[in-house]
Amino acid sequence: MDKFDRQILEILQKDCTQSVSDVAQQVGLSTTPCWRRIQAMEKSGVIKGRVALSDPEKLNVGLTVFVIIRTNQHNPEWLESFAEVAQDFPEIIEFYRMSGDVDYLLKVVVPDMKAYDVFYKKLINRASF
């Protein structure tokens, strides 16, 4: 990757809906070489896809909460069981295994604190920590 590729990536990460000719103009290339660079980055996996960013407030999930999970069960069966429980909660959008004092970290999105309380009670009812 050279400076043109990095510039193209930076532009596309800010707004991937721009035309190739607009991107080319911004980086100082003609359209065809810019298009070839984008195609090469897609083919090599540097560019995995193009996404639309949503507004959490408009989707009624304006509160993001990070939930720390500690457990004394460190076996594959427990992890599989907990992962199945977590999949039943659309509020959990990310799930990480950690190191140190924290075993797992959940990223949860809900409309407000009241909704988080409801989520939390449902989670502790279903999971065994």
At which residue positions do the language-model features occur?
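A compositional/biophysical signature of low hydrophobicity enriched in polar/charged and small residues
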Residues: 1-129
